[in-house]
Regions:
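Active-site gating loops and adjacent loop-to-helix segments of metal-dependent hydrolytic enzymes
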Residues: 58-94, 121-129, 156-175, 226-251, ...
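A conserved active-site cap/scaffold subdomain adjacent to cofactor or substrate pockets
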Residues: 261-305
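Active-site microenvironment of metallo-dependent hydrolases
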Residues: 1-20, 25, 344-430
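Divalent metal-coordination and catalytic microenvironments
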Residues: 8, 22, 27, 51, ...
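His/Asp/Glu-enriched, well-ordered alpha-helical/loop segment
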Residues: 246-249, 253, 294-376
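Alpha-helical scaffold segments that flank or form the walls of functional sites
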Residues: 62-146, 176-187, 423-430
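Metal-coordinating catalytic core of metallo-dependent amide/deamination hydrolases
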Residues: 122-257
Length: 430
């Protein structure tokens, strides 16, 4: 027997609808009806989180001190390596459990975990090559978030096939061992393929990885830092996205994560191929990466929490819009001709692009996963704008993932114990 939900408004693929009844069966939306009164809350489709490194949740607030030299992404990376070398499998599960709980409480209902912390601290493989991935899957199962595992191929420390550095020893794989890792991840649930970057995979390896992915999601970091752009130019004579578009079969199943430093021609090329721009505005601001040129991009985009320094879907959207306002010296930059309400345009765009990047159905529609979020409000555009631009705390009330309620009145049932276990882990690690 289908379960039914009635809302005063719901954000459907075609826009807002009033007095909406959803029928849910076996984790999917069986029917969407309008004109059914009696609902009180506003329903939003669950937000996909298209880029996360769950273990980095343990770094939040611990890299905000200036060192003796100029601080940058690259100095932050050295601190991240120290954490990565200390993490044990149980620590990965603890960090991921808290991160996934916080994602759900903020309205993320699915996450693409860009996972590269594969091996033991000395670089040897665990008996189960997917031990760390299995911990991520366990955390997702226990919290209820929908997980796309993206095991990362990381074989080199720089362009031209440079050998990995000693502190990167937990990340490395050959194509053969990576294929075994992918097979293990596929047994754990939905999975894709993730070359770390053009620095970490040669063209021959990237070609093999694209073949391995087939039509599954393929995600790659690209053009996050100007130093990467300069190194790619020195190596190939081309910019990173330009190089990818010329040498790889970039298509709709590709997500180009960050793509911060791109030209209008590269932006047009990404859009023409159907690649999703994976934007992580809070992390990109935290690391001083730069600002994605959204005004030059006509393609799909989604949002990710990346380093998990602050996990909040609405604040990612806020940072995205405000960064564009600062760059363009205009207001309401991400609004569109068809959706002039900025928060609604941001939300709808990120849901659509994020769902494509994760290879899942997105939106409140028949056949889609029954993953949705409720907020309070009478006028839905204003309610969503307040949640994105004016809320001091998340305005999410309840969250369902595949028909299961995982957040009630803004709180996940595991929130308290997840935080206590996380704090105890930090006391050991830091």
């Amino acid at each position: 027997m289908p379960e039914t939900f009635i809302f005063s408004h719901a954000l459907l693929p075609g826009g807002w609808a009033r007095d909406v009844r959803l029928s849910v069966a076996e984790g999917r939306i069986a029917a969407v009806e309008t004109g059914i009164g009696g609902g009180r809350n506003v329903a939003l489709p669950g937000m996909p989180n298209l880029h996360s490194h769950a273990f980095q949740r343990a770094m939040a607030g611990r890299a905000e001190r200036r060192g003796a030299t100029r601080d940058s992404f690259w100095t932050w990376r050295e601190l991240m390596y120290k954490l990565a070398l200390a993490m044990q499998p149980e620590d990965m599960e603890i960090a991921a459990t808290l991160a996934f709980t916080e994602m759900l409480e903020s309205g993320f209902t699915a996450v693409a975990e860009f996972h590269y912390l594969h091996h033991a601290p000395d670089g040897t493989h665990y008996d189960d090559i997917g031990e760390m991935a299995a911990r991520l899957a366990a955390a997702a199962r226990n919290t209820g978030i929908e997980l796309l595992l993206l095991p990362v191929f990381y074989a080199h420390a720089g362009f031209g096939g440079a050998a990995l550095r000693e502190e990167q020893r937990r990340f490395g794989n050959t194509l053969e061992s990576y294929a075994r890792l992918c097979e293990r991840c596929a047994a754990l649930g939905p999975s894709g393929v993730a070359p770390h970057s053009l620095r970490a995979a040669t063209l021959a390896e990237l070609t093999a990885l694209a073949t391995l992915a087939g039509t599954r999601p393929l995600h790659i970091h690209v053009a996050e830092q100007l130093a990467e752009v300069e190194a790619c130019l020195a190596f190939s004579g081309q910019r990173p996205v330009e190089y990818l578009l010329d040498h790889a079969a970039v298509a709709e199943n590709w997500c180009l994560v960050h793509a911060t430093h791109i030209t209008p021609a590269e932006a047009a090329g990404m859009a023409a191929r159907g690649a999703v721009a994976g934007l992580c505005p809070i992390t990109e601001a935290n690391l001083g990466d730069g600002i994605f040129p959204a005004h030059d991009f006509a393609g799909a985009y989604g949002i990710g929490s990346d380093s998990n320094v602050l996990i909040d879907a609405a604040q990612e959207l806020r940072m995205l819009e405000y960064s564009q306002r600062l760059a363009a010296r205009q207001r309401n930059v991400m609004a569109t001709a068809t959706i002039p309400a900025t928060a609604t345009a941001l939300y709808a765009g990120a849901v659509a692009g994020g769902a494509r990047a994760l290879g899942i159905g997105g939106g409140i529609a028949p056949g889609a996963p029954a993953s949705f979020v409720t907020i309070a409000g009478d006028d839905p555009d204003i309610a969503l704008a307040q949640a994105v631009f004016a809320a001091r705390t998340p305005m999410v009330r309840d969250v369902w993932v595949n028909g299961r309620r995982v957040v009630r009145n803004g709180r996940h049932e595991l929130a308290r114990i997840a935080r206590a276990r996380f704090d105890a882990m930090l006391a050991r690690l830091v």
